[in-house]
């Protein structure tokens, strides 16, 4: 078939994923339909190609054995999802999250006026969610935890509920973009660029600059909007949410809540640099030791079974992001499509520095795919074209694509945004503009800043 039909098929596949998930169809089977559209419009044998994108092994042109496909990501990501979800449940069920956020609020907000307490409350919510994502707890697994914590903090400092979505989305963005993060996008970058030996700290200085810029600009903007709401006499109201308990006699000491949060990233950076899930598993063990005994017991239930129940609930939650692994099939399918070569040619022939072209490709592909498939496609092109042929530094490519991943992942039709708005019961016109400014506009400017730094000062890679 012609490249035009193939390109139209790729565009239609993106539309199917975006439209039907927005309408409430589950991502798992919607993606499979989109993959079939790519196969058919590109004249690809359906059964054979589907098997190959799930798992393919063989001998490359240099005589080396290789394995590729979605299954190669599953071996890293499935245990990370599992232990991340378990850790998240232990952290919330024990009251560790409430203890840490309450301590931050009380220490930083002591003797502060109303405006400063609101600013500190915003910081606490964003910081807590960033920590969850930084240590590898999947956003889906931490969603309900953070809604509970954010509700309690926002009620305490009187920030209107319509600002809750931007706090949670921004925290996810910051935690994902931080150098050393165990967030899935960072792990994907490591996996796809494995032959170039990039690490989670690739181009760390530009990465930290990105986080400081986005966080600083966003805090300024959020504080400005919250102050304006206060001047208009807007108050917090619970709506469908229940308040989180920020006080209690049986909460774990703050020091015990911090220990596992230190162990996980340190373990990932040292002993378990090739196995992020192992660092998370050790973090779970540390969590059980540090605050497992603080999980409230039910009458007649032993301490061991109380901890086991919390872990069991974590396993159940882990199934949500695990199913989303199927979403990666779209990225592999598009990368294998003959028409994809035309897309690659378009981006590689853009005028200007190749790294900037890679950044724009990452942003647009993620926005079009509305999922991690866009990042997978961009990483594949980076590994096969931009790095070996166009001479882009692997560490620079890693960092630029990771931060590019944060720009269009929070569009209105994003599954996480739709879920947040629904659960919190906030109308788009009330809650989305703040998200658009902070995690779309500011992150876009941050990507340009990172690319410019790495182009002007290549030694930062």
Show which residues each predicted segment covers.
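Core transmembrane alpha-helical segments of multi-pass membrane transporters/permeases
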Residues: 54-99, 276-277, 285, 289, ...
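Alpha-helical transmembrane segments
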Residues: 76-81, 202-215, 275-281, 396-405
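Hydrophobic alpha-helical transmembrane segments of multi-pass integral membrane proteins
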Residues: 80-84, 110-149, 327, 350-390, ...
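Short helix-coil transition sites and intra-membrane helix breaks within transmembrane domains
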Residues: 23-27, 75-77, 88-99, 132-145, ...
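Membrane-core helix-loop-helix motifs of multi-pass transport proteins
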Residues: 151-251, 416-454, 459-461
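Long, contiguous bundles of hydrophobic transmembrane helices that form the permeation core
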Residues: 2-14, 31, 41, 205-309, ...
């Amino acid at each position: 078939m012609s490249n035009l039909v193939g390109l139209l098929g790729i565009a239609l596949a993106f539309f199917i994923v975006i439209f039907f998930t927005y309408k409430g169809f589950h991502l798992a089977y919607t993606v499979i339909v989109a993959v079939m559209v790519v196969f058919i419009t590109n004249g690809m044998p359906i059964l054979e190609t589907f098997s190959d994108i799930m798992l393919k092994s063989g001998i490359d042109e240099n005589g080396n054995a290789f394995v590729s496909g979605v299954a190669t990501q599953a071996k890293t990501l499935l245990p990370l999802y599992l232990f991340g979800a378990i850790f998240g449940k232990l952290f919330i069920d024990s009251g560790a999250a409430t203890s840490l956020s309450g301590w931050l609020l009380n220490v930083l907000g002591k003797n502060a006026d109303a405006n400063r307490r609101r600013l500190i409350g915003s910081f606490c919510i964003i910081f807590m969610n960033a920590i969850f994502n930084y240590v590898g707890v999947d956003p889906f697994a931490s969603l309900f935890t953070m809604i509970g914590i954010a509700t309690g903090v926002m009620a305490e400092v009187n920030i209107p509920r319509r600002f809750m979505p931007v706090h949670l989305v921004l925290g996810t963005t910051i935690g994902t973009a931080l150098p050393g993060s165990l967030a899935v996008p960072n792990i994907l970058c490591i996996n796809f660029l494995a032959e170039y030996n990039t690490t989670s700290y690739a181009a760390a200085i530009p990465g930290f600059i990105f986080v400081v810029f986005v966080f600083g600009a966003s805090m300024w903007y959020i504080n400005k909007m919250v102050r304006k709401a206060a001047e208009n006499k807007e108050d917090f109201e619970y709506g469908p949410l229940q308040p989180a308990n920020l006080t209690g006699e049986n909460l774990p000491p703050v020091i015990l809540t911090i220990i596992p949060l230190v162990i996980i990233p340190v373990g990932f950076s040292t002993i378990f640099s090739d196995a992020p899930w192992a660092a998370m598993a050790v973090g779970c063990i540390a969590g059980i030791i540090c605050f497992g005994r603080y999980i409230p017991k039910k009458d007649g239930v032993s301490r061991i079974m109380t901890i086991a129940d919390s872990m069991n609930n974590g396993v159940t939650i882990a199934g949500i992001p695990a199913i989303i692994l199927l979403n990666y099939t779209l990225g592999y399918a598009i990368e294998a499509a003959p028409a994809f070569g035309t897309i690659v040619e378009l981006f590689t022939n853009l005028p200007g520095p190749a790294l900037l072209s890679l950044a724009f490709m990452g942003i647009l592909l993620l926005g079009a795919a509305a999922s991690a498939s866009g990042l997978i496609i961009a990483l594949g092109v980076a590994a096969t074209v931009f790095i070996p042929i166009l001479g882009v530094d692997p560490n620079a490519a890693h960092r630029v694509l990771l931060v590019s991943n944060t720009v269009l992942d929070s569009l209105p039709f994003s599954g996480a945004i739709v879920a947040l708005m629904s659960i919190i019961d906030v109308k788009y016109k009330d809650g989305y503009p703040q998200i658009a400014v902070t995690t779309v506009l500011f992150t876009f400017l941050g990507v340009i800043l990172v690319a410019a730094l790495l182009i002007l000062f290549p030694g930062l890679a």
